[in-house]
């Protein structure tokens, strides 16, 4: 919660030489962070707010998502419909849904958005953009009970790559930033006082699920 975030931040202020923090919300800068020296603070991931006075390495959950899906369009064209699974209470920018919808409209896809994998079953000729890793595992289990093959009967596109996506089923295609690049830049900020103000590009990791 915002209250817990504020409490943790308040207790840590003045105790460290550098602060590497993911802001609580993507849309609004947390006021508690204004108490930290801007030269000591690096903002990560969320950042759809004015942050010109700070170093940041962020994801673009809006246009980045759109462009990432565009890079996968040849694979997505195999499917007649795109479905986004976006859990109601997931701490992921809600604006991603609007860019998903806009992509589908711009490129002629039928589309739907569900709040959980319990609300939908794998269907033939449908590709699913699934944000949460646990939902992907649940969805693969469902598909096996229905004798549907991921990457052939239906598709899956994940958000944010993980090592497990390389080995789940025949590999899960993911839209992701380069986490190694982010880690290297964090180290530069901490060790060498390197300043950053950038959004990392959204990349496509194409695997068997699409």
List where the protein language model places each region.
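Alpha-helical recognition/docking segments in bacterial nutrient-uptake
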Residues: 1-67, 127-128, 134
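An alpha-beta-alpha
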Residues: 66-107, 198-210
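Hydrophobic alpha-helical segments within soluble ligand-binding/sensing domains
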Residues: 47-83, 136, 175-195
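Flexible loop/turn connectors
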Residues: 122-127, 134-210
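Short, conserved loop/helix-junction motifs that constitute active-site signature segments
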Residues: 33-38, 76, 146-151
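A generic secondary-structure signal
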Residues: 11, 71-75, 102-103, 142-146, ...
């Amino acid at each position: 919660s915002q209250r817990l975030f504020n409490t943790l931040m308040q207790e840590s202020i003045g105790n460290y030489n550098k602060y590497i923090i993911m802001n609580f919300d993507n849309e609004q800068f947390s006021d508690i962070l204004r108490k930290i020296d801007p030269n000591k603070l690096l903002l990560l991931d969320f950042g759809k707010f004015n942050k010109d006075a700070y170093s940041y390495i962020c994801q673009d959950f809006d246009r980045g998502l759109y462009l990432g899906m565009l890079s996968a369009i040849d694979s997505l064209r195999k499917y007649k419909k795109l479905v986004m699974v976006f859990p109601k209470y997931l701490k992921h920018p809600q604006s991603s849904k609007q860019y998903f919808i806009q992509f589908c409209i711009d490129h002629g896809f039928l589309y739907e958005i569900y709040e959980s994998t319990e609300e939908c079953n794998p269907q033939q000729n449908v590709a699913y953009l699934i944000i949460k890793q646990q939902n992907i595992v649940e969805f693969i289990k469902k598909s096996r009970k229905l004798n549907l093959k991921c990457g052939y009967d239906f598709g899956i596109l994940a958000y944010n790559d993980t090592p497990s996506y390389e080995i789940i089923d025949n590999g899960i295609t993911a839209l992701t930033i380069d986490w190694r690049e982010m880690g290297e830049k964090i180290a530069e900020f901490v060790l060498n006082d390197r300043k950053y103000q950038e959004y990392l590009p959204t990349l496509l990791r194409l695997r068997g699920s699409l």
